[in-house]
Amino acid sequence: MTDSENGTLVPAAIAEPDLRDPLLYVNRELSWIDFNQRVLEEALDSAAHPLLERVKFLSIFSSNLDEFFMIRVAGLDDQCAAGINERSVDGLTPIEMLERIRERVIGQLRQRNACFFDDILPALKRKGIEFVSVSSLSVEQQQLLQHYFRKEVFPVLTPLAFDTGHPFPFMSNLSLNLAIELEDEESGAIKFARVKVPGILSRIIRLDQIEGLGFDDGRIRLLWLEDLVEHNLDQLFPKMRILQCHPFRIIRDADIEIEEDEAGDLLESIEQGVRSRRYGKVVRLDINPDMPHSIRSLLVKNLETYERNVYEIGGVLGMSALMELLKIDRPDLKDELFVPNNPLDDKRTADIFAEMRSGDMLLHHPYDSFKPVVDLIWQAARDPDVLSIKQTLYRVGSNSPVVKALMFAAEQRKQVAVLVELKARFDEENNILWARSLEDAGAHVVYGLPGLKTHAKLTMIVRREQEGLRHYLHLGTGNYNTVTARIYTDYSYLTTDPVLADDVTELFNSLTGYSKHREYRSLIVSPLNMRRWIMEMIRHEVDHQKHTGNGRIVMKMNALVDEEIIRALYRASMAGVKIDLAIRGICCLKPGIPGISENIRVVSVIGRFLEHSRVYYFNNGDHARIFLGSADIMPRNLDKRVETLFPVIEPRLVESIKSDLELTLSDNRKSWEMQPDGTYIRKRGGRPAVDSQRLFMRRSLRRKKNIKKKVKGL
């Protein structure tokens, strides 16, 4: 352009890219669909896992999809019903999202069915595990099986008619049902009935374990429960002729909405909300393609749903039930048993307090055992010098040694304060039971702050010692759940750091009382300051990049959704900061876009264990700062939950976490890399071969062997 005063040429200003451009973002829901596709790929890959582990991934894919419909699709359905056409950050309206979800899911279900019927079933048969049908059995076997049906199944069934005298039967969420058309043998009248396949019984029947059937050749024969019910319908409908029978399965809206400000008793309100899940609107109706239009339309009309919510599945409905096959005792068809390392096994005494006083401890689960965490709480419960235990509980499991330790401590007259998050989705009933049990034991139980879920993972133990009161802390990235601790990757940080202890004390006071503490010296807390802190840390790396050229950010988490922080990462990339993101699930950021995100790499590791840890690494001018915690980068985590991030200071632990991150990022066997268009490509090949989870297991086993040698030498 020309300078108007002197006529000289000056360069035109380079336009700043519009970082709100929808093309720069991946749709949240479709990104989740992509994640579940990566789970499905584990089942499809015959070289990746033993046979029954592939079955497990089919089950996980299916149960994931069910939950997605119960929550996310249900929400989109609500928006469509309310006439909401607001576009998401990527430019899609709710109805457009539903259309794309349906298209993607139908393709995935076809893949899943082809995998199960054309690949896995024949492979199972070759290994001596075979699904059979009732009709394939001999007449004598069918008669014996009929006796089994009368004794074990018939008493649980409830046939329900539908006509002018019988209202359309209620059908609960996730229920598998049989739609039956009947003819009255006396009047010739055509009737309709429904039979629910009882969820209280095993969905898969082991015929080889039923006495008298003659299956004693060592092979395992399996039968679907619905097949047995269908072949014995004449016992449920005497003097009726069975014209046709078709299975169907429904999924309902399961999202609970509680107006906490109006709820007089939160626990009671949550209980009512859990019960209401049974009555949520139908968001998916699974049928087989051969269901006639007459029955299909009858179901759609009376379930008050839409044709767009009907999915012709084909084959077996409700494949999450395949998890039952993992009960089969065939170690040759499963992953080799892995027993984690317990770093305290080499100690003469099991005094965890003494270990923590000697230095901070970092456990990397499941490669390191969760047992030291459980032992810490039990030791505190039994120790007469321990005065109080405070803990947050989100998902703890149905038979929790952690909660039992807290109950024991309360019974010993220790001050026990527990925040039980009643709103932990699909764990509400379990948490309600534990909350009542803790109260009965004498613990102080609170349910958190109104309008906020408490997702932070914190334990604080106060102990009287010669020098005065000392605080022992456990801070984690995962739940206090001994079952998931064996299959989720997480970190546990055990410390007596006094500054961190002061912060945790203040946070517990905020959670259990009316404290309005606003400043923390070490802890990062949402919704108070976490969003601001992450933005500041990203800006600091931009400054380091400008001055020293060594700006680097590594983040590991389950999901990256927040638009404001994605824009900040884009700006950091534009400034030259190298950014590595290990995001297992949803990622709305697009890497590798020239001029915008070319310095960002996104990978997703899907393997034997579920990647669950949250790690935030900032190079900080080669003086690395590492924070661990409970928060993903999603609006809900930053604005609507109580989350914590905590610093790891001790150099040896910082180096350990850095090493873990580099190993995860170098994975070229179980890792997927996101492309600039938002799609993923499996990282395969490359030398040396790096399967990060397998290498973490090997490292754990080496440490275990070293501990055994050390113990022998004591």
Curated annotation (Swiss-Prot):
InterPro entries, sorted: PP_kinase, PP_kinase_C_1, PP_kinase_middle, PP_kinase_middle_dom_sf, PPK_C_dom2, PPK_N_dom, PPK_N_dom_sf
Catalytic function, reaction form: [phosphate](n) + ATP = [phosphate](n+1) + ADP
GO terms, molecular function: ATP binding; metal ion binding; polyphosphate kinase activity
Database matches in Pfam families: PP_kinase, PP_kinase_C, PP_kinase_C_1, PP_kinase_N
CC cofactor: Mg(2+)
GO BP annotations listed: polyphosphate biosynthetic process
Highest taxon, organism lineage: Bacteria
Binding, ATP: 64, 488, 584, 612
Binding site for Mg(2+): 395, 425
The enzyme's E.C. designation: 2.7.4.1
Gene3D superfamilies documented for this protein: Endonuclease Chain A, Polyphosphate kinase middle domain, Polyphosphate kinase N-terminal domain
Top EC category: transferase
Active site: 455 (phosphohistidine intermediate)
Gene Ontology CC: one annotated term: polyphosphate kinase complex
Entry keyword set: ATP-binding, Kinase, Magnesium, Metal-binding, Nucleotide-binding, Phosphoprotein, Transferase
Post-translational modification: An intermediate of this reaction is the autophosphorylated ppk in which a phosphate is covalently linked to a histidine residue through a N-P bond.
Purpose: Catalyzes the reversible transfer of the terminal phosphate of ATP to form a long-chain polyphosphate (polyP).
Family: Belongs to the polyphosphate kinase 1 (PPK1) family.
Annotated PANTHER family: POLYPHOSPHATE KINASE
Name assigned to this protein: Polyphosphate kinase 2
Organism: Chlorobaculum tepidum (strain ATCC 49652 / DSM 12025 / NBRC 103806 / TLS) (Chlorobium tepidum)
Lineage, broadest ranks: Bacteria, Pseudomonadati, Chlorobiota, Chlorobiia, Chlorobiales
Gene coding for it: ppk2
